Amino acid sequence: MSAQEQGINEVPTCHGGLENLDAEHDYWIDDIEGSLPSDLVGTFVRNGPGRQRIGNKPYGHWFDGDGMLSQFTFSGSQVHFRNRYIRTPKYIEETSEQKILYRGFGTQIPGGFLKNMFRFPANPANTSIVYHGSKFLALNEGGRPWEVEPGSLDTVGEYDYEGSLKGKSFSAHGKV
């Protein structure tokens, strides 16, 4: 029986703490113990790696996991949850092929050193989320921001500040 079949995470840097969440969800949370403050109204969104393997092949480092947004919307006494993967080329193509196709921070594509040597790591858009310049942006240090729609969390696409962002990287750890 494989480690995955036993429920063991094969990525040594994860120490068993991170597992895939393959499904996207959209539902009202019914099971709340106690009550929520009536003036708790708003939305909290977080970003993080939602997938640590593709098919049976684990990524080499948890930094390479595909970005997943998790959104909690509070409306007085109710909470709604929605999660969505950010549809980067890496996510779309690896999901379709069910194999690793992009080099990452700690993940090599098949083919050895020469195949990986001049390839920059893919941008999994998995580090943070900010609202800046009227845009909701998913960030990663290894690439440009990815714009997503507030509320639906649908991916709009890579955002380059209307051509003014010339580089291929962007800080994902902004301070306010």
Where do the PLM segments sit?
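Beta-propeller domains
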Residues: 1-176
